[in-house]
Amino acid sequence: MFRVANPSTRDPKRSRVFVVVSRQLLIDSNFSTVICAPVYTKYHGISTQVPVGVEDGLKHDSSIHCDELVSLPKTSLTDYIGSLSADRLNELKLAMKIALNVEG
């Protein structure tokens, strides 16, 4: 997870945490961007959101929103927050499958 300063002109926050969801091959490639899921303090309990919190390196309870994927420049991913646990990563994988309507 990374905190990104000024993520977009439409985002009211000065910074936002994002989780990189691109595959490692893309992350390690010469492509300049990666796909990320934003983290918001709102949690609606839907299957495409993954609850995260202090135990994941955040200041307060939040959720990863897999329905709102964005492409971010790799150069903006400089403020490392932390990694997801294996259990949380499995929850994220399931939420991504649901959000993208992918079976398997």
PLM features per residue range, with description:
Residues 1-104:
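Conserved functional hotspots at enzyme active or ligand-binding sites that engage polyanionic ligands
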